[in-house]
Each structure stands twice: as structure tokens, then as C-alpha cells.
Amino acid sequence: MNTQTRETTSMSDAQDKAGTLIEALPWIQRFAGTTMVIKYGGNAMVNDELRRAFAEDVVFLHHVGIHPVVVHGGGPQINAMLSRLGIESEFKGGLRVTTPEAMDVVRMVLTGQVGRELVGLINSHGPYAVGMSGEDGGLLRAVRTGTVVDGEEVDLGLVGEVVGVNPEGIVDILAAGRIPVISTVAPEIADDGSTTGQVLNVNADTAAAAVASALGASKLVILTDVEGLYANWPDKSSLISSLTASELREMLPRLESGMIPKMAACLQAVDDGVERAHIVDGRLPHSMLLETFTTAGIGTQVVPDEETNA
């Protein structure tokens, strides 16, 4: 007779796990078959435990019938490479100033390092992820843009604003049962609609919003390094769990500069028909699952004006 030593779990622990699965069931049913666009960035990109947890979350979403689309930046990695090469980084209004020299580094890091590493992490669970950039298949189109700081126009160099998304490539990848992983560089478009031959650095938050809108996504989730949006930063008791598009539009000019692109992206997505947009703390392992599959959720959600409840 063979005997086996089995790892035992207390009945209460087992019941807790069962309760978690049951709580997730209505949310799995609600979002199965829909597309979820996730902007991957912040500390979740540089901490090994968080990187692995993020990849697991994406694969879990895939296996329960949700179609995840990952749009990533690479701020920490870009900063590290620019520093290594002796190229100074400058930010204005929360956006990177990109010189031609810096653009070469941005393109190299986003498409050749960050994207490939993320694809590899996801594919450690199976052959699911396919890497692409905004240049591939005419996915993204952008025009050069600046920003306004203290009421004055500021030139951001080779920084673009997405003005068009061709979602066919993403749709084809999803139809093949794969997970698109998109690097946010994009070809520049001239006034006549032709390409100029220049590649632009596109803010990943706003690019993710544009992709979510083009795909008719059920959710846009932006991972960041704070718990969510605060009504009175730095008072952490003022965390806002949910607000409408109109409420966010009124708050936007008063926000900290680093939060403006993220919250503007949420507002853009909801205004363009995405059902809801979320700011989620990427420093928390499995934060996407907590947001998507628990009744309380985490972080801050933005909903259309006609909807006030999650």
C-alpha cells in the first residue's frame, strides 16, 4: 500500500477560498467575452514579484473568457537607460520632453526591452502573448503636441497625441486567442494624413484610452503607484472610490501634475463610450483581480454621468 503526505488546509481557509470564488462568479459572468484594456506601468514594472503577479492576472483574465489588451509605458526603464547613457530626462506637466536623441532610446527600450520582457512573463504560462507597437499595422497615428504649464504653452519635442487607432491588428490577435502587448510609440501624421517618417513618444495612459475607445472595451484599467484619486491630497482618508465624468472634469485642473494624464485618460475613455475606467494601485499584488472580481473593488473608478453605482 502506498501512502502520500498531503498538504492540509484548514476548513475555514478552504471555505474562505470557496467564498472568494463565489464572489468572483457574477463578475466573471458579467465581463466574459468583453475586452479589457490595461495600462501597465509604475512600480509594477520594476518589482519582480509585482511583475510576475501582473502576468498571472492577465493570464487569469484570459482563461475566464475576458480579452485583455495590455498597453505599456516604460518610464522607469527609459529613465535608467537615459541615465546610463548620460542623457538628461525632463518632465513638464507630467509628460516627458523627448529630444531626437532620447527618442532613439525610448523606442529601443519600449519595443526591445519592456515589451519583450512582458511578453516573456505572460508566455511562461503558455503561448498567449504577442508583442506589437503603435507602428505595427498602422495601429496608432499621432500628431506632435505640447502641453500647458502655468498657463503657458510648452514644447515637449517628439511627443505625440494619438489621433487615430486602427484596431484591426489587435482584433486579429484577439480572434486568434492571443493577448496583445502594445508598446506606445507611434508614427507621426502630417496635415494631409500622410506619415512624416518620424516616430513619436506617446503617453501610455492616453494611448491606452484611445485603444480602449477604438475596441469598445468594457473597462480601462490604469495601474499606478498610488491607491487612487484623492479629493484632498495628501489626506489619504479622502480617497475617492467612484466619481462621474462630470465630477472628474470639474476636478481635473486642480490635480497634481502627475495624476493629470492618468485621470484625463480615464475621462477620455468614458466620454468615448468605454463603460468605466479605473485607477488601481499597481504596488498591490493581484490588484487587477481585486478590482475586477470583488464586490467592493479597489482604487478609483470613473463612470458615465448617467451611472453613479458600480
From Swiss-Prot:
Q: Where in the cell is it found?
A: Cytoplasm
Q: Name one GO molecular function term.
A: ATP binding
Look up the domain of life of the source: Bacteria
Its pathway is: Amino-acid biosynthesis; L-arginine biosynthesis; N(2)-acetyl-L-ornithine from L-glutamate: step 2/4
GO CC, alphabetical: cytoplasm
The UniProt keywords, alphabetically, are: Amino-acid biosynthesis, Arginine biosynthesis, ATP-binding, Cytoplasm, Kinase, Nucleotide-binding, Transferase
GO BP, one annotated term: arginine biosynthetic process via ornithine
The UniProt catalytic activity note for this protein reads: N-acetyl-L-glutamate + ATP = N-acetyl-L-glutamyl 5-phosphate + ADP
* InterPro entries from the UniProt entry: AceGlu_kinase-like_sf (IPR036393), AcgluKinase_fam (IPR004662), ArgB (IPR037528), Asp/Glu/Uridylate_kinase (IPR001048), Glu/AcGlu_kinase (IPR001057), NAGK-C (IPR041727)
Function, as annotated, reads: Catalyzes the ATP-dependent phosphorylation of N-acetyl-L-glutamate.
What is this protein called in UniProt?
Answer: Acetylglutamate kinase
Could you tell me which species this protein originates from? Answer: Arthrobacter sp. (strain FB24)
* Taxonomic lineage from the root: Bacteria, Bacillati, Actinomycetota, Actinomycetes, Micrococcales
